[in-house]
Amino acid sequence: MTTHDRVRLQLQALEALLREHQHWRNDEPQPHQFNSTQPFFMDTMEPLEWLQWVLIPRMHDLLDNKQPLPGAFAVAPYYEMALATDHPQRALILAELEKLDALFADDAS
């Protein structure tokens, strides 16, 4: 299985987790919310919105078009800080993000 395949499976697992716990939204953010220059669109989106509307679709776009994946990639550290310590699915979300990050660490070595 290629790195692209493993990344796709992990993105699907992350999406399934967000859907299972009702963190997947049907209402798309306003167009101006995608114009952020901040990492993770901190100034225009909530952390889980960014996963749904930015990270997951952009990564799928790279995969679908057989483009190179980012060399340096780590989102879990941001989510360790961004998700409230009492968020009910914090540990589950962080675990899935750490698995995603590990795929890029493995690919870099």
From Swiss-Prot:
Gene3D superfamilies: YqcC-like. It comes from the Bacteria. InterPro entries: UCP006257, YqcC-like_dom, YqcC-like_sf. One of its GO terms (biological process) is single-species biofilm formation. To the N-terminal of E.carotovora exoenzyme regulation regulon ORF1. The C-terminal part is colinear with YqcB. PANTHER family: CYTOPLASMIC PROTEIN, CYTOPLASMIC PROTEIN-RELATED. This is Uncharacterized protein YqcC. It comes from Escherichia coli (strain K12).
